[in-house]
């Protein structure tokens, strides 16, 4: 009986370690620093572009989003930005966004899950004092033909 319990214990330990080892090994965010840096850079640049605009040049931001977003992210963004396009000129709204921190939570060859923190500064009209805010986003990205695209965005 003791031998059987010991054997079961050893087997469970080996299985648990092999499962966690293979899960960690398949997450390139833990094992491939250059790939992690690449997706971090690409997604940071994307978010800086699509969440920054001036009331008189919203088309520049919309064009960037059309190029850099895919799938659900693009659909959601288009709905949100329709409101911006309508309201920003009347308020003379300018928004500057900058990614302040990024955590790549999961990374495979062509897919990534990231947690991103944005610092945002909005100026309305002739106000000299910007309003500042922070945002957290869960981002899903996909590599297509060697380029990273945001495919889903969700506030956290």
Predicted regions and their residues:
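Surface-exposed, charged secondary-structure patches
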Residues: 91-124
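Short linear capping/connector segments at secondary-structure termini
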Residues: 26, 60-64, 101
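Solvent-exposed, non-transmembrane alpha-helical starts
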Residues: 125-131, 151
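Core segments of small alpha/beta cavity-forming domains
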Residues: 31-90, 94
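Short beta-strand edge/turn micro-motifs at domain boundaries
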Residues: 113, 134-156
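Short solvent-exposed loop/turn micro-motifs enriched in small/polar/acidic residues
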Residues: 97-98, 132-134
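Short, low-complexity Ser/Thr-rich regulatory SLiMs
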Residues: 5, 106, 141-143
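Juxtamembrane and targeting peptides
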Residues: 1-48, 52
């Amino acid at each position: 009986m003791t031998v059987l319990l010991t054997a079961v214990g050893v087997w469970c330990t080996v299985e648990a370690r092999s499962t966690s080892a293979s899960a960690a090994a398949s997450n390139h965010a833990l094992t491939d620093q250059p790939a992690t840096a690449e997706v971090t850079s690409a997604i940071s640049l994307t978010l800086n572009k699509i969440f920054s605009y001036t009331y008189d040049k919203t088309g520049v931001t919309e064009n960037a989003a059309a190029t850099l977003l895919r799938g659900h992210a693009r659909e959601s963004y288009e709905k949100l930005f329709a409101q911006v396009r309508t309201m920003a000129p009347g308020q003379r709204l300018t928004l500057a966004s900058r990614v302040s921190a990024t955590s790549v939570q999961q990374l495979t060859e062509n897919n990534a899950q990231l947690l991103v923190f944005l610092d945002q500064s909005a100026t309305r009209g002739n106000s000299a004092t910007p309003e500042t805010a922070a945002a957290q986003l869960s981002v899903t990205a996909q590599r297509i033909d060697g380029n990273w695209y945001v495919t889903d965005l969700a506030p956290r």
